[in-house]
């Protein structure tokens, strides 16, 4: 193989091509590659942070859900206690009202019985006087008559 001018020209052309590529083509390519690597690294870092944030959010959501359930159970328990209290108060009030109505009924019955007794005494006194008048055929004067009636009413 002989070295001739063509080979020397090709070598010089190749060196100029390499120098041109190193000067003008290689730096933008390297910048693009480095920029792409940086974007990928940033994306991976963001993904890692997002995964941690998601995990923290899930833990926080779970805690809030537990707190909400506990609060709901507490509210339900308080409502049940209040319901029982209202029912007990209603029972006490109903018993009080029942006792009041019964006492009022007994008082009314007693009053009616006393009134009926008094009416009956008066009627018996009137009948007794009428019977006595028929027997005595009006031999007793009016003053004695009133005195006898009053005594009969007092006895009855």
Swiss-Prot record:
Key words of the record: ATP synthesis, Cell inner membrane, Cell membrane, CF(0), Hydrogen ion transport, Ion transport, Membrane, Transmembrane, Transmembrane helix, Transport
Keyword Cell inner membrane: yes
GO CC, alphabetical: plasma membrane; proton-transporting ATP synthase complex
SUPFAM superfamilies named in the record: F1F0 ATP synthase subunit B, membrane domain
Compartmental location: Cell inner membrane
Single GO MF descriptor: proton-transporting ATP synthase activity, rotational mechanism
Membrane topology: Single-pass membrane protein
UniProt-listed InterPro entries: ATP_synth_B-like_membr_sf, ATP_synth_b/b'su_bac/chlpt, ATP_synth_F0_bsu_bac, ATP_synthase_B_chain
Pfam families per record: ATP-synt_B (PF00430)
Superkingdom, taxonomy of origin: Bacteria
TM stretches of this protein: 7-29
Presence of the UniProt keyword Repeat in the record: no
Function: F(1)F(0) ATP synthase produces ATP from ADP in the presence of a proton or sodium gradient. F-type ATPases consist of two structural domains, F(1) containing the extramembraneous catalytic core and F(0) containing the membrane proton channel, linked together by a central stalk and a peripheral stalk. During catalysis, ATP synthesis in the catalytic domain of F(1) is coupled via a rotary mechanism of the central stalk subunits to proton translocation. Component of the F(0) channel, it forms part of the peripheral stalk, linking F(1) to F(0).
Family annotation (HAMAP family): ATP_synth_b_bprime
Summary of subunit composition and partner proteins: F-type ATPases have 2 components, F(1) - the catalytic core - and F(0) - the membrane proton channel. F(1) has five subunits: alpha(3), beta(3), gamma(1), delta(1), epsilon(1). F(0) has three main subunits: a(1), b(2) and c(10-14). The alpha and beta chains form an alternating ring which encloses part of the gamma chain. F(1) is attached to F(0) by a central stalk formed by the gamma and epsilon chains, while a peripheral stalk is formed by the delta and b chains.
Similarity remark: Belongs to the ATPase B chain family.
Name of the protein described by the UniProt record: ATP synthase subunit b
Species this chain originates from: Shewanella pealeana (strain ATCC 700345 / ANG-SQ1)
Organism classification: Bacteria, Pseudomonadati, Pseudomonadota, Gammaproteobacteria, Alteromonadales
Gene: atpF
């Amino acid at each position: 193989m002989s070295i001739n001018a063509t080979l020397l020209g090709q070598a010089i052309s190749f060196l100029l091509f390499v120098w041109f590529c190193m000067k003008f083509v290689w730096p933008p390519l390297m910048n693009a590659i480095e920029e792409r690597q940086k974007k990928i690294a940033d994306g991976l870092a963001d993904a890692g942070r997002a995964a941690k944030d998601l995990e923290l959010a899930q833990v926080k959501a779970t805690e809030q859900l537990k707190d909400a359930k506990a609060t709901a159970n507490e509210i339900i328990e308080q409502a049940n206690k209040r319901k029982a209290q209202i029912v007990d108060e209603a029972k006490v009030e109903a018993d009080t009202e029942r006792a009041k109505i019964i006492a009022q009924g007994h008082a009314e019955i007693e009053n009616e019985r006393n009134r009926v007794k008094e009416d009956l005494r008066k009627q018996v006194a009137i009948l007794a006087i009428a019977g006595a008048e028929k027997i005595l055929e009006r031999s007793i004067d009016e003053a004695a008559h009133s005195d006898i009636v009053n005594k009969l009413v007092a006895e009855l």
